Amino acid sequence: MDFRIGQGYDVHQLVPGRPLIIGGVTIPYERGLLGHSDADVLLHAITDALFGAAALGDIGRHFSDTDPRFKGADSRALLRECASRVAQAGFAIRNVDSTIIAQAPKLAPHIDAMRANIAADLDLPLDRVNVKAKTNEKLGYLGRGEGIEAQAAALVVREAAA
């Protein structure tokens, strides 16, 4: 069996006038994340981790932020397409672990819904998807509430040809 690990990272600036969508969940907050798509920082990090694990490049290679087709795109749809491309490359997704770093808002009440969305989009059992939320202890741009960051790791496997 051919096991592969990928890691992903994303960060977006918090700005007024946009919804805050993380893990496919709309979170009540006075600011949202700035981006070409819906700017779902968590799903972008997971997408990058999956593409990386399968050696398929990164999210920008597949869903360019200069391509008008992806303007305002639903990152859950992008994640599902990523999973399809990973499968077409011969890999099965085994698990995803992720961390969101945000000073505010509190994300703990939304984590179960995020996990459920990710598990559904990747066709994984819930116990193979983990989401953690941390603050940056008021340090740096994250601590000042200027943005939100996410990191992710993914494990994929390709069975050896018989």
UniProtKB/Swiss-Prot annotation:
Site label Transition state stabilizer, positions: 36, 135
Cofactor binding mode and count: Binds 1 divalent metal cation per subunit.
Pfam family, one: YgbB
Top-level taxon: Bacteria
Keyword Lyase included in the entry's annotation: yes
A GO term, aspect molecular function: 2-C-methyl-D-erythritol 2,4-cyclodiphosphate synthase activity
Keyword Metal-binding: yes
Residues the entry annotates as binding 4-CDP-2-C-methyl-D-erythritol 2-phosphate: 10-12, 36-37, 40-48, 58-60, 63-67, 102-108, 133-137, 144
Catalysed reaction equations from the record: 4-CDP-2-C-methyl-D-erythritol 2-phosphate = 2-C-methyl-D-erythritol 2,4-cyclic diphosphate + CMP
Pathway field: Isoprenoid biosynthesis; isopentenyl diphosphate biosynthesis via DXP pathway; isopentenyl diphosphate from 1-deoxy-D-xylulose 5-phosphate: step 4/6
Cleaved signal peptide residues: none
InterPro entries noted in UniProt: MECDP_synthase, MECDP_synthase_CS, MECDP_synthase_sf
GO terms classed as biological process: isopentenyl diphosphate biosynthetic process, methylerythritol 4-phosphate pathway; terpenoid biosynthetic process
Residues reported in the UniProt entry to bind a divalent metal cation: 10, 12, 44
This enzyme's EC code(s): 4.6.1.12
Cofactor(s) the record lists: a divalent metal cation
Keywords linked to the UniProt accession: Isoprene biosynthesis, Lyase, Metal-binding
Quaternary context: Homotrimer.
Record function comment: Involved in the biosynthesis of isopentenyl diphosphate (IPP) and dimethylallyl diphosphate (DMAPP), two major building blocks of isoprenoid compounds. Catalyzes the conversion of 4-diphosphocytidyl-2-C-methyl-D-erythritol 2-phosphate (CDP-ME2P) to 2-C-methyl-D-erythritol 2,4-cyclodiphosphate (ME-CPP) with a corresponding release of cytidine 5-monophosphate (CMP).
Family the UniProt entry places it in: Belongs to the IspF family.
Full protein name: 2-C-methyl-D-erythritol 2,4-cyclodiphosphate synthase
Gene name in the database record: ispF
